């Protein structure tokens, strides 16, 4: 397999404290930072209520047997408008006016101040659509499986105590889940009537090509099926899921600030009169009255028409940005929470493309000038219809083409190629063989058997994650945040019952009146920043330790283990992040670690866990020691070995065997039955 050269990332961000891009000892800077902090708080308040109101609106549609429409930027814009105090400007017409009225009818919240936030809220609207659609596209099939599991666990809750019954039940309901997702009927006959009754409540009856394809094309038609499953789980009093994302965290979140947002927030017509004269070159004259013919005063509104020409001057007025990135230019956009900020850089290869987009957008706006609202709406609707038709045409053209499997798509340019996907010449040299895990993040060994373990305890100590958690918990307990948040535990944010969700919203918004001012304390954002810095430093230290133990010239062969879902009662641990960090310094190749943990590297027989009794344990029960494996030695005596060392030795064995023969050892292949 020949590796293709990766195209450059379009954007790159540089994260740093916002204080590092501010002019020093400047009173205006302090005033502007106060404006920015208030804008962040106001934006968070608006978006929190918008999520709540949108979810409530969707539930009203469902319970009134109305079709749940596609959620667009217009939908979110009207939802936000219903939450904000009235502002001057053109009133919504047509479909937008109907949407606004719908939201106002169900809105019971206090109104928020949305002045000078239009650009920031536009970005948030896009973020919200992404969050809503991703929740459907990426989690729907997991929710279907969870629903089927919960339903039949409840149905057979008495018999499920029997291990054999439980094993057989899971085997049978796996077929039921596959039948629902693939629209087949291969499960046991006893499930047919249930499937016939519930299938099209769980998934749509009409779909295009397959459910996996259809959900990518039309995600919103799956919302009602998610609500149905939630309501059924509520009836059974089983754990539900969140069919619609909401914003519950009261810590100030990041906002995106571009040139337009900068002008909206910081430029004042009177205060910056001289600057406006410099920035705005076009002269406008008064066309009537006694001052006819005299130059018009330049305003903040005039500046919006020439942002592109003046963006560098505008940013230099308010921020001291001197940071650079090789082959990248500053994109005049920052993402900030008021303490930390990310400067966005655009790759030089994409500058022309982005400029063309802006010119096209500007030309489109110019073409709409002077048209009535109805004419503008018709043009927009025609454009949407044309895009839909073109997308449908493309789908039909691609329908007959042979489809690549996900595996084939990945193989074309994998992030971490497997050892059998690259020429053997690329694997020649010195090797570090790594067995990834939870307790020991990386257990590694070189060709000579030199062993090193990078543990989760080392990672936690260096990142200070537990220390910051404890400090914040103590602080929250002391100022009363914990007590208020515990009071919300009696409400269910996942409920699909309108009355109960309305109760939750009312309680949460009331709690936020106290929580939001408390969470504005910089300490919360500070520790978030410190965690980020420590994480980056820890990753660098990890690589330095590996280089010191071995060398930069080694090739890494790493097991393809991944946890999939977070284990209960075990702290979350990094895997892919650290793997990518290794790739910055080393060549990294995956190896299929099938059976490398359960077979003894010496005898190739199945290992068992060691069980021991502890003197301090009064019950004298034998306890499993997960980190130690036992195996039968050749002299029929029992031997012990560290699980991680055994894994590394097995990976070495499989790798060396592959280099010699191009195959896997027989007992480590999936065809061999143990």
PLM features: residue spans?
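Positively charged, helix-rich recognition surfaces that bind polyanionic ligands
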Residues: 2-674
